[in-house]
A protein has these predicted regions:
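Short, structured segments at the rim of ligand-binding sites
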Residues: 1-241
């Protein structure tokens, strides 16, 4: 699966592009037309707030202007498969990209299986999905995700290490993990291994866990989302989360 953001943007500027599988073909045009480019919100960043809305009791949040490109929307599909109360509103196109406002409400989640073709659409969201699985009733299995081992950290081992110290029943596998959820995790000392997605995932986990959580190397979030903690804490102080 190849993400098609570039093809969509060029098409919005008058480019003539065809694609098949992982091959994109650009056909000649006289000129491209200048456009006002509006970049949608990144669903990989929105995923943490989606998860927070689902696992923190009493939550109801609206995340506006999020890109929901089908090559990136696996997080939405998995949340729904786990019983998450998620709705897409104001669906539209901006510069060729599908965009929506995502409404999330606290839900009683249940386990699911995440595997196969959906993996490329949510590879960066798997750590926060593992956190959601810890709060969900029943078993969640993640497989076909060996790429997690060669990210900024070995995310399979690191998620297993940190969820275990929070009291979660998790077993790492060669290409994923098995999580038996349903018990509220306890606060713990979390090692981020300087991986921004690990730090952000456990900041969300801390919102709904018992006791205090300390994330070592928490400033690693600056690589992708420098204002993450400010935004998360601002939301946590609101009337809905």
């Amino acid at each position: 699966l190849s993400r098609n953001h570039t093809e969509l943007m060029l098409g919005a500027c008058g480019g003539d592009i065809s694609s098949e599988g992982t091959t994109a073909t650009l056909h000649p045009v006289k000129r491209l037309e200048a456009q006002k480019i509006i970049v949608p919100g990144d669903i990989s960043s929105a995923a943490y707030f989606m998860a927070a809305g689902l696992i923190v009791p009493g939550s109801e949040i609206c995340i506006e202007n999020v890109g929901i490109n089908p090559t990136r929307d696996g997080m939405i599909r998995v949340c729904q498969a786990m019983g998450g109360n998620i709705a897409l509103e104001n669906i539209r196109e901006i510069c060729g990209e599908p965009v929506a406002d995502i409404i999330v409400r606290h839900s009683s989640l249940h386990g699911t299986v995440v595997e196969g073709d959906i993996i490329p659409t949510l590879i960066d969201e798997l750590p926060i999905i593992a956190v959601m699985a810890a709060f969900a009733e029943g078993q969640t299995i993640i497989r076909d995700a060996a790429e997690l081992r060669v990210k900024e950290s070995d995310r399979i081992s690191v998620m297993a290490e940190n969820l275990s110290v929070m009291g979660v029943d998790i077993t790492p596998t060669t290409d994923g993990m098995i999580i038996n959820g349903g018990r509220t995790p306890r606060g713990a000392r979390i090692q981020s291994h300087m991986d921004h997605r690990i730090a952000m995932s456990f900041a969300v986990a801390a919102l709904a866990s018992d006791g205090e959580t300390d994330i070592i190397g928490s400033d690693c979030v600056n690589i992708s989302y420098p204002t993450f903690y400010q935004d998360l804490f601002k939301l946590a102080k609101s009337s809905f989360i």
